[in-house]
Amino acid sequence: MEVEEAAYRTVWSEPPKRPAGRTKFRETRHPVYRGVRRRGGRPGAAGRWVCEVRVPGARGSRLWLGTFATAEAAARAHDAAALALRGRAACLNFADSAWRMPPVPASAALAGARGVRDAVAVAVEAFQRQSAAPSSPAETFADDGDEEEDNKDVLPVAAAEVFDAGAFELDDGFRFGGMDAGSYYASLAQGLLVEPPAAGAWWEDGELAGSDMPLWSY
């Protein structure tokens, strides 16, 4: 950001404005912002602000950019147009306009005064909307959400690596009750061939009185 600030001239680094020749301009011109003057109302009273910018290579020609509710908005409009028309040679009202203001497309400059004016209005509106937008809870906890997403990706992989490494591998004697695998599965097969006990053999006296559900239900 410091590089961008040093690359552009600003009204704060330039010599003070020369006194305006016409009385009207002396009364309405903004004391600091370049290309901005008040429209309507008495000096010192609230009013709207207009903006115009000098056209490079056309002596005495100015490009009218429109009327704005605040002097700051008009000053931002001046910066957007100056960047489009003059590039690095532009003198800005705000040093951060070089990177905070949406750029005016080159096609707008080629379209003439109307194209530049329309593009500047869009840029100022986008800048004001972005500056006024409050930070939402989703943005406040965005980092926490990202961390959770990272954990979702990392933890299963780590667990898979542990199991793949055989850290929980058991020997056959522990898994099959002291028998080898063949004898263990053979005993299971024999158990499936045994007839279930007679109905009522597994009733608990007194505890399941009145219940029709046999314990041997499979």
Curated annotation (Swiss-Prot):
Protein name, as recorded: Dehydration-responsive element-binding protein 1B
* Function of the molecule: Transcriptional activator that binds specifically to the DNA sequence 5'-[AG]CCGAC-3'. Binding to the C-repeat/DRE element mediates high salinity- and dehydration-inducible transcription. Confers resistance to high salt, cold and drought stress.
Q: Which PANTHER family match?
A: DEHYDRATION-RESPONSIVE ELEMENT-BINDING PROTEIN 1B, DEHYDRATION-RESPONSIVE ELEMENT-BINDING PROTEIN 1D
Q: Name one GO cellular component term.
A: nucleus
Report the Gene3D superfamilies cross-referenced here: AP2/ERF domain
List the residue ranges of the region (Disordered).
Answer: 1-26, 131-151
> Which family is this protein grouped under?
Belongs to the AP2/ERF transcription factor family. ERF subfamily.
Compositionally biased residues, Acidic residues: 141-151
Q: Which InterPro entries match?
A: AP2/ERF_dom (IPR001471), AP2/ERF_dom_sf (IPR036955), DNA-bd_dom_sf (IPR016177), DRE1A-I (IPR045277)
Compartments where found? Nucleus
Q: Name one GO molecular function term.
A: DNA-binding transcription factor activity
Its primary localisation, in coarse terms, equals nucleus
- Tell me which species this is from: Oryza sativa subsp. indica
Identify the DNA-binding region of this protein by residue numbers. Answer: 32-95
Q: Kindly give the SMART domains that the UniProt entry links to this protein.
A: AP2 (SM00380)
Q: Does the keyword Nucleus apply?
A: yes
Keywords (A to Z) from UniProt: Activator, DNA-binding, Nucleus, Stress response, Transcription, Transcription regulation
